[in-house]
Amino acid sequence: DKLYGNTLQSEKKEKLVNFLVASRGNHQTLKDFLSPIRKEKDAVSWEEIRAIWILESLSAKDLRDVTLDVLNDHLLTNISDWEKIETDLFKRMYLNPPRIANEMLTPYKKELREAIEKTVYQSVPDSMKRDPKVLIEWCRKEIKINNELNSQQIPISPMGVWKARVADEKSRDIFFVAAYR
């Protein structure tokens, strides 16, 4: 057991060094993200493992661009589901990169999830909440497509689409992925 713990610890250190180097000038953000999570010097907590999984999901560019708010939003949202779901399924469902396409990195996960639960899924049985058809139908009815409003083709953030209910097709698609995750 101690040998396994030492192996985990050395793997963690190696990964963290790689993240810090890859983040270039953004290393302080990663350190600030990881600092409150560290429980014991010689142990690896589940929260640390989830944080490392999130960092692993980031592209090289996102390691340089990501903010502390985005990382914390991604880490702290869905924690209640952690205990209920098998690890590999949890990673596939919830630990996707915060950036979906080429939109700005913004902390949207918690606010969007709460908003969708209160509106889109309010009258939907639990068994249907993971059915993408429910969200697709809601998007068709509630989000107006207007490609002319976004002449520079800069994607609107998922929360921007949620609040405006108007978007170009690409921003609507990014919103759908964010909402479904």
Where on the chain are the PLM-derived regions?
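Cysteine-centered nucleophilic/redox motifs
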Residues: 135, 165-181
